[in-house]
Regions:
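Glycine-rich, aromatic-lined ligand/substrate-binding cores of catalytic
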Residues: 326, 332, 348, 390, ...
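Extreme N-terminal leader/targeting segments of oxidoreductases
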Residues: 1-18, 36-37, 505, 546-556
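A conserved FAD-binding loop/helix module that cradles the flavin
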Residues: 68, 516-538
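Active-site/ligand-binding neighborhood in enzyme catalytic cores
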Residues: 138-251, 258, 476-492
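Flavin-binding catalytic cores
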Residues: 366-387, 432-472
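Mid-domain catalytic core of redox enzymes
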Residues: 233, 242, 262-267, 272-406
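N-terminal glycine-rich phosphate/pyrophosphate-binding loop and immediately adjacent elements
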Residues: 6-149
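A glycine-rich dinucleotide-binding beta-alpha-beta segment and adjacent secondary-structure elements
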Residues: 200-211, 389-395, 453-520
Length: 556
């Protein structure tokens, strides 16, 4: 039985109980839970399609993921789907790590030893260093066993059974607190930490260069545990988006696309879209870029000086902060069967061509007096080296689900971390299209060296997504995929796991926030978690409001 009854019929057609802005996984999660409680909820999305950075698109019969290449459960994703009554089949998604001609597949924790053996073959002068680093990885994996040792209680039925409380939840909470303290002692940047273990910069870069810049040590090393948790939804990552959409609509929720919120009047609780639509609300959830949120608040209509001061403080706090590294992705359609790529890369691979890594390559090489050079040759030569010594993440959907490419063909998704400001600079120099062609040819060349000679002859179509195109599409600061950069000092948002419930609150009581900009480190599981926490906070406030209006009798 639902605790809430929608007030839709008693108010104008432009009034809703809750407006959710942004249809990424955080917004979809929150809307699903709010609609489940029969609140009158409206989800607004500025693009023509929902899903944000999660989901896929179809090109000539190939289904290609636009964001996450796979799904990490983290004790959150599968319990969330189960709680909502959504049944999705998840397929195997083994991770390969390939460096030069050396390769391993991570299937269980014992494979970390094989990873260490591979590193020792590549760097025989650093065997003792590698042994120490392996112990660090295994130490973090043990902490992860506790942190994700049970399914997140937030997504389990309540009230909890006594047996679960006494034998599972309470013992886990005790261990959780102890291990979060251990985790908090490992928040130095991963490269700095590894320099206390080895002086081989190539070894350091090979381990870390596919992580976001300045990633804290614990979160970087925890990926060796998370790699074992990767799964792939049958039908592509779009399956999750479609199932959540279907649930929202079946529960009476509403979704409107091509509606970009341009103004929020926090006093009258009204929003206005760029398309001229106006809505009033009781509660609002912002599940999009934080900078954009504070920019669309109409400060002229705020009567409370205290509230205005808090909002202006937030604006100032975020104005010079940078988003995390963005990603450049090349989508390639090949007239070759999947097995040509399967033996080398598998369905999901981190492929590094050169064991030297990015140790001798830096953005500073193409900067002068803090500005990027305008010398085209210098820029393109640097990009060539950057790709050659970098780590490419290669995802091949058809190797997980054979229905995702036409028979005898393969769709490849090849990506690497890339700097937003550099792409913006190339665009300003009118080199954007040439840059995309250049980097595509580099990717194909390196894939060809590992797979099929003259691979370019078999590639019949390519599409390139850059940090700039991500920023234009999503309005995410600097085209970020995972919120704020760890390099920001001070860090602009909450990062302490024990305070994550508070992260969804904003200075405005009637507005909550969720998604990658709300809590770091961000990703699909954390975005889902903040979406659920935000929906719980909204439901609590709505219950409180209805209780006051009815004198509390219905809720005593």
């Amino acid at each position: 039985m639902n605790i809430l009854t929608s007030s839709w019929r008693s108010k104008s057609m432009n009034h809703v109980d809750v407006i959710v802005v942004g249809s990424g996984i955080a917004g979809l999660t929150a809307t699903a839970y709010l609609s489940k409680e029969k609140l009158n909820v409206l989800l607004l999305e500025k693009e023509a399609e929902i899903g944000g950075l999660l989901g896929s698109f179809n090109v000539d019969g190939h289904v290609l993921d636009k964001g996450a290449r796979g799904i990490i459960n983290s004790g959150i994703v599968i319990p969330m789907l189960r709680q909502l009554g959504i049944d999705i089949e998840f397929l195997s998604n083994p991770i390969k790590i390939t460096i030069g001609s050396q390769t391993i597949t991570l299937t269980d924790e014992s494979d970390i030893e094989r990873y260490g053996s591979m590193l020792k073959q590549l760097y025989p002068d650093n065997i003792c260093d590698i042994d120490i680093i392996l112990k660090d990885i295994q130490y973090v994996m043990k902490i992860m066993d506790v942190l994700y040792g049970v399914e997140n209680p937030l997504f389990l039925p309540k009230p909890y059974e006594m047996d679960y409380l006494t034998h599972t939840l309470l013992p886990w909470i005790f261990k959780f607190v102890i291990n979060t303290r251990k985790m908090s002692k490992m928040l130095d940047p991963i490269n700095d930490f590894l320099r206390t273990r080895t002086n081989n910069e190539s070894l350091i870069m090979i381990i870390t260069q596919h992580f976001f810049s300045m990633t804290p040590t614990f979160f970087a090393l925890s990926y060796f545990k998370l790699y074992l948790q990767y799964h792939y939804p049958k039908g592509s990552t779009q399956t999750i988006v479609d199932q959540l959409k279907s649930l929202i609509l079946s529960n009476g929720g509403k979704i409107e696309t091509n509606q970009e919120v341009m103004r929020i009047d926090v006093e009258s609780k009204q929003i206005t879209t760029a398309q001229g639509q106006r809505y009033s609300y009781d509660q609002l959830l912002w599940a999009a870029d934080t900078n954009a949120f504070y920019q669309v608040i109409d400060r002229n209509n705020i009567r409370s000086r205290k509230l205005l001061s808090k909002i202006e403080h937030k604006i100032k706090r975020y104005e010079n902060k940078t988003g995390a590294d963005s990603v450049l992705t090349g989508y390639m359609l090949a007239d070759l069967p999947p097995q040509y790529f399967g033996n080398i890369f598998g369905p999901h691979c981190f492929y590094t061509v050169r064991k030297e890594g990015l140790a001798g390559i830096s953005l500073e090489d193409i900067r002068q007096d803090g500005m990027f050079t305008k010398d085209k040759k210098r820029l393109f030569d640097w990009i060539s080296d950057f790709v050659e010594y970098n780590t490419l993440e290669i995802s091949i959907p058809v190797l997980r689900d054979p229905t995702l490419s036409p028979e005898g063909q393969t769709g490849l998704i090849v990506s690497l971390l890339f700097d937003y400001q550099l792409v913006k600079h190339l665009d300003e120099l009118k080199l954007y299209e040439e840059f995309k062609d250049h980097i595509t040819s580099l990717m194909i060349k390196h894939l060809s060296n590992a797979t099929v000679e003259d691979l370019n002859k078999y590639i019949r179509k390519t599409i390139v997504s850059t940090p700039l195109s991500i920023a234009r599409k999503t309005h995410n600061t600097h085209g970020s995929l995972t919120g704020w950069s760890f390099a920001n000092k001070p860090f602009p948002t909450e990062y302490r796991i024990i305070r994550i419930a508070k992260s969804v609150l904003t200075p405005v009581d009637s507005i909550k926030q969720a998604g990658q900009w709300t809590f770091n480190p961000a990703g699909v599981p954390v975005s889902i978690l903040t979406g659920k926490l935000a929906s719980d906070a909204i439901i609590k406030d709505v219950v409180k409001s209805i209780s006051k209006k009815k004198g509390g009798s219905d809720f005593e």
